[in-house]
Amino acid sequence: MLDNIKQTAKHTLIYSIGNLSTKLIGLILLPIYTSKLTTGDYGILAYLETTSLFIITILSFGLPTGILRFCTSDNKEKDKEIIFTVFTFALAISLLVLVPLFIFRLQLSHILLEGPKDLALINLLLVIIPLEVINSLTLSVIRLREKSKFYVFLVVSKFTLALLFNIYFIVEKGMKVEGIMLSQLISSATVILLSLWFLSRNMVLRFHPKLLKEMIAYSFPLIFSMISSMALAMSDRYIIEYFIDFSELGVYSLGVKFAGLINVFIIQSFQLGYLPIAFKIYNQPDAKKFFTKIMTYLTLVLIVTSLAVSLFSKEAIILIARKNPDFWRAFLLIPVLCLGHVFKGIQYLLSLSMHYVKKTKINAFVVVFCAALNIGINLVIVKPLGIFGAALSTFFCYFVMAVIYYFYSQKYYRMNYEWSRIILLFLTGILLFLFSHYVLEEVNMLNLLLKLVLMIAYPGILYVLGFYHKVELERIGQFWKKWKKISNLRENILSLQQSEDTLLKDYD
């Protein structure tokens, strides 16, 4: 048991590092994108990325998850048949869909973009999509075989190549969106080439139609949930382009990318580490007490990071896009989008209650409903309110998700959350932001320092208002006493391997 837990932790950590590198490329390249691309170019890039993700999700048929579900280490020969069958089916479906699209690519360029002048982008898009479908299946096979180091090698190789070719095509060759997509094509194709030897050792040339039918029956319903989640997060891109233009979409996408730091570094990292623990302990006597504390602490972290991102968003956007003032308006969207991410984190925790009681159909209903709600609200308010309306819609829909999940979770897995503390976090965070927004509006060194003082003072403000419990203050004191000595850093890191009993320790 302990060996399995250690193995799981090891692979999870390695996968986290690999996945994080793929998220970083867009952030690292932001200064180049904003200096070399117009807002319209950046809008086109965001539009094509969204389109690509939707099509890849549909063509994948949920089979990357199906591979992990149906392949077992008990019968490796059968696993090889399944893997060959899945790859063959994925290639066939991709060709069946993409060949007609390629034939009618001129018409597609009129539908998606601005006609023949963007035909090269459509061509690149139609080549990238099947490569990404194959890559997603390949990475699932690597995870199945627990080759985590090879997984990271491929992901980091892709990241490095994409980064270098982006710089080459954009800075050296003066290319724009076409250069970015060409970089993606080269890096995706390279990953496939690097993984051919591995795949050849994990396949046998035997097609298994009966197993394929079972896998599709299992995996296909997952598509609707995934598409609904994507529609909730991304459908506003299409509506902004339809009602306004690519230029406004570019400004909006920069705001989304910047606020998305919270999702990448806090929410996704938390999900990766928390989920195995939650499923392991949810039936234990003190589990609910643990979960309520986690809700409070996650909300604290989300509000602190959202406040930090919001307070310094104006300075950061101006710094990143200093050569292109057309992007600067993006900072106005960031506080609302950050608040949406706070509720995204909260609704995630609340939604887990449906997993504990095996009522996951409720999750599917909530996601589909909120995706439809987001689309409906955007259709109504984007035209009069512009991109700020899209940001408001995103925030509101995550808030609605949290409310719905709260009522369902209280019905099936009741917990007494610390709402007084959570409300205090929201009120203090919002008031500090409003003070900064209206009093420290100008961008100068003095205001920057005052904002920094506000952030440093925030934990102290919470202390004055009685947010912390006695045991928490004691733990903070112990933590500081232990970690302030740099010489003990290695021992302290090793000591983080806490027992399950520590996680569930009474907070009274």
Stretch-by-stretch model annotation:
Residues 2, 439-508:
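Membrane-proximal transmembrane or re-entrant/amphipathic helices at the cytosolic face
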Residues 7-65, 93-102, 128, 159-163, ...:
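Signature of the first transmembrane helix
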Residues 119, 123, 152-200, 218, ...:
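Hydrophobic alpha-helical transmembrane segments
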Residues 60-75, 144, 255, 259-296, ...:
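Helix-loop junctions and terminal segments of transmembrane helices
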Residues 1-4, 8, 177-178, 193-233, ...:
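Interhelical loop/hinge segments that connect adjacent transmembrane helices in multipass membrane
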